[in-house]
Amino acid sequence: MRSSLTMVGTLWAFLSLVTAVTSSTSYFLPYWLFGSQMGKPVSFSTFRRCNYPVRGEGHSLIMVEECGRYASFNAIPSLAWQMCTVVTGAGCALLLLVALAAVLGCCMEELISRMMGRCMGAAQFVGGLLISSGCALYPLGWNSPEIMQTCGNVSNQFQLGTCRLGWAYYCAGGGAAAAMLICTWLSCFAGRNPKPVILVESIMRNTNSYAMELDHCLKP
């Protein structure tokens, strides 16, 4: 089975898959921010949370120890986190699409040319830039009341208070940086140049097809 990728292209496809899966998995896991509330550990992502308070019997607050997403988009604690959810999600989707095409290029001949590989690298740069923008927007939501309750009521924008950043935040940012810097550069050498013989055969095949259609139309 011939590949449409060079040896560098095969490495590019592998790294593209790794960065896409790393960033996307980190996006969905609620381990971007760690804190505590009512003596229980609490963690957040942009649209998910683990352990949250609810009103129990007698209107007392109790902690529900489970993970889940917010009930609606508007329930996300801050506008900055809402924007982060959309921007980061779009970037992850773009990286996954490019990674899928790159993996298919390892198995299919003539799928990815030199120019196509560079265009896919540009798409990876945009995807990584979107995820990086989401990571940059994330600290803008640390001044919301829900986050302040978890971070000792002393957190603010770009100030964690008693909270700390989680490993998923770093993985998302690291995956985005690798996609922008490494994968984009490798994509310039990923695709094979089309062979002249293949180009001639393709042109002749199309020409013959058009000639047959024209001849069929001209016949009475």
Swiss-Prot record:
Record keywords: Glycoprotein, Membrane, Signal, Transmembrane, Transmembrane helix
Name under which the protein is recorded: LHFPL tetraspan subfamily member 1 protein
Subcellular location: Membrane
Species for this entry: Homo sapiens (Human)
Transmembrane segment boundaries: 86-106, 122-142, 165-185
Bilayer topology term: Multi-pass membrane protein
Signal peptide bounds: 1-20
Taxonomy, superkingdom: Eukaryota
Chief site of localization: membrane
